[in-house]
Amino acid sequence: MDVNPTLLFLKVPVQNAISTTFPYTGDPPYSHGTGTGYTMDTVNRTHQYSEKGKWTTNTETGAPQLNPIDGPLPEDNEPSGYAQTDCVLEAMAFLEESHPGIFENSCLETMEIVQQTRVDKLTQGRQTYDWTLNRNQPAATALANTIEIFRSNGLTANESGRLIDFLKDVMESMDKEDMEITTHFQRKRRVRDNMTKKMVTQRTIGKKKQRLNKKSYLIRALTLNTMTKDAERGKLKRRAIATPGMQIRGFVYFVETLARSICEKLEQSGLPVGGNEKKAKLANVVRKMMTNSQDTELSFTITGDNTKWNENQNPRMFLAMITYITRNQPEWFRNVLSIAPIMFSNKMARLGKGYMFESKSMKLRTQIPAEMLANIDLKYFNELTKKKIEKIRPLLIDGTASLSPGMMMGMFNMLSTVLGVSILNLGQKRYTKTTYWWDGLQSSDDFALIVNAPNHEGIQAGVDRFYRTCKLVGINMSKKKSYINRTGTFEFTSFFYRYGFVANFSMELPSFGVSGINESADMSIGVTVIKNNMINNDLGPATAQMALQLFIKDYRYTYRCHRGDTQIQTRRSFELKKLWEQTRSKAGLLVSDGGPNLYNIRNLHIPEVCLKWELMDEDYQGRLCNPLNPFVSHKEIESVNNAVVMPAHGPAKSMEYDAVATTHSWIPKRNRSILNTSQRGILEDEQMYQKCCNLFEKFFPSSSYRRPVGISSMVEAMVSRARIDARIDFESGRIKKEEFAEIMKICSTIEELRRQK
């Protein structure tokens, strides 16, 4: 029998059909090779948008810099970065007038945070430009290297452990005439391989001391390394993103803390909240506009898109904003916050790895590093690349390009949102002084604008005024990519609104399935994803039940753990059948041991081990939850773990799931090949750093973060904490006298060893 597909939709309101339009099957595109070209594009484009600005030369680094601020007012619709200082300051003043005390209160909150934040805040985050080695490293390693070199150069304020003191060291380091650093270099030698008898190139890494003069150090401190943004769907061209170094990170963090605090108080801001909270906030703004427009007014909404948001923003503008926001605050606080925008006004973009050349005839490949682009003969390049290099050459110093205007992706999301909201705020009738008025939503570079007016001419006039006002602060609404609709239907940050936000369940599809961490985590993540989608994304009970059955099937195929009584033959089926036959209570076996699935949509919140515990044979319980099992290398299990799930687009999301430690929570061993390479030393450093941090966390569980103040090292802090805890435990009778004595003895030994060192 043929099914007419339209019948499926007869009873469905059209907005619910959005999940059938899902375009993102298959893997997203990843970038390969060098990002140098994309970075040059960014630098050249940014300068083009500000080309009518004034050129100056940085006295310290000799870098040529373009300043478009208070440049010519735009005469056409081309995107431009000529923000007018007085307009930005006025927008800030009006924002404060509409929200009395907002800046004052946010400053007070931030000041408190600034004084309490520890330097280990900077270990969060992924890849970071490590200025000591001139390449990217994990954040924790980059921070450790920076602090080590600061200390060896006599900068020791950071020993207090407060972030603000580390930043004092950063400031001082910039005044020093030179900095001595330890850097890595590679030696290559040709040796004969014992096994294959072929000649191979062996690489070893050496460490050497190197002096950087003031200019070289400043260039490194102001450098943002660049990479290609991966896994971006719906784009033909890749684009570059930036990773700043440790000198910039701390200052940016404090600015963003202040901006976040302001955003939390602004009803038009889509940051920093997310998910359902964000939807509720946005729905309020829409409701307000629609209620007012019921009788006499028309209401239209623009689903907005800005042209090259961050390439037209300017750090100098952010400096003006911060100067205004903090105007009544203590001098030290104003100084700390103004450093990030000042550093960004003087930033250098590192061009990345350079270009790879190969000669087909001679089977030769060679890499032209970015440092050589300044003076290499251009005849080797194609026309497109030639043009890029010619354009960027005047800006190059040591393989980095001077990039004063523009912000680079993802650096000041919160602060730029404040700027956007300040323009939305000007739409109130008391400011427009006419019959039209506007309001809207802003989240970083994404916006939705709702305009109300008595007639169509008024709507048009309102949109025009908004467009021009934005131009004055360096925001360029794209007329080509924005579209207007009757209020009630629009899109904002991938939320679709039609008489309320529509659950677009298909966006979550890529996160369904088996994650591939281990049997225990995968089961837990799988059911949690289904549970979360029932809560947040209108995943109905029937569909959820089906998703669950598909997931279990997928899980059994992944881990080859079909039920013990199945006919399917796999590598594991022999063992699993044997286990099935020996087990009295078969319902107690975990799915990964060939047991039945006991999950249904009512009990997804219970970890599988807990669900089946009462049903398990005793000896099975003993084997399953046995920390001494020699075949399993264990993670320490917190009650809640975090998994990274990938929605169809937007950033990877972190999702909490319950973790119960069993012999199935194994960790795959690290690939051995790295241990035989030059990277081994770095790996060992990292592991040691990890171990120290974990140990420290044991002594100071986050619930009791009364951190030791005025103690110069982690070791001293841990020893003093151990003594206090031991005394409390001894006095309350939790430990015996002998144990107490032993702890005290160990503490003394540690202190003795430190003194000898």
From Swiss-Prot:
Where is the motif Nuclear localization signal annotated in this sequence?
187-195, 203-216
Q: Which GO terms describe its cellular component?
A: host cell cytoplasm; host cell nucleus
- Mind telling me which PROSITE patterns this protein's record contains? RDRP_SSRNA_NEG_SEG
State its location(s): Host nucleus; Host cytoplasm
Q: Which organism is it from?
A: Influenza A virus (strain A/Teal/China/2978.1/2002 H5N1 genotype W)
Q: What class of enzyme is it?
A: transferase
Q: Does the keyword Nucleotide-binding apply?
A: yes
From the UniProt record, list the coiled-coil ranges.
none
Q: Which region ranges are annotated with the description Promoter-binding site?
A: 249-256
Question: Which family, according to UniProt?
Answer: Belongs to the influenza viruses polymerase PB1 family.
Q: Which reaction does it catalyse?
A: RNA(n) + a ribonucleoside 5'-triphosphate = RNA(n+1) + diphosphate
Pfam family, any one: Flu_PB1
Q: How does it assemble?
A: Influenza RNA polymerase is composed of three subunits: PB1, PB2 and PA. Interacts (via N-terminus) with PA (via C-terminus). Interacts (via C-terminus) with PB2 (via N-terminus); this interaction is essential for transcription initiation.
Q: Mind telling me how this protein is modified after translation?
A: Phosphorylated by host PRKCA.
Protein name as it appears in the record: RNA-directed RNA polymerase catalytic subunit
Q: What are its E.C. numbers?
A: 2.7.7.48
Give the protein's biological function: RNA-dependent RNA polymerase which is responsible for replication and transcription of virus RNA segments. The transcription of viral mRNAs occurs by a unique mechanism called cap-snatching. 5' methylated caps of cellular mRNAs are cleaved after 10-13 nucleotides by PA. In turn, these short capped RNAs are used as primers by PB1 for transcription of viral mRNAs. During virus replication, PB1 initiates RNA synthesis and copy vRNA into complementary RNA (cRNA) which in turn serves as a template for the production of more vRNAs.
Please name the InterPro entries in this protein's record. Answer: RNA-dir_pol_NSvirus, RNA_pol_PB1_influenza
| One GO BP | symbiont-mediated suppression of host mRNA transcription via inhibition of RNA polymerase II activity
Q: Which UniProt keywords apply?
A: Eukaryotic host gene expression shutoff by virus, Eukaryotic host transcription shutoff by virus, Host cytoplasm, Host gene expression shutoff by virus, Host nucleus, Host-virus interaction, Inhibition of host RNA polymerase II by virus, Nucleotide-binding, Nucleotidyltransferase, Phosphoprotein, RNA-directed RNA polymerase, Transferase, Viral RNA replication, Viral transcription
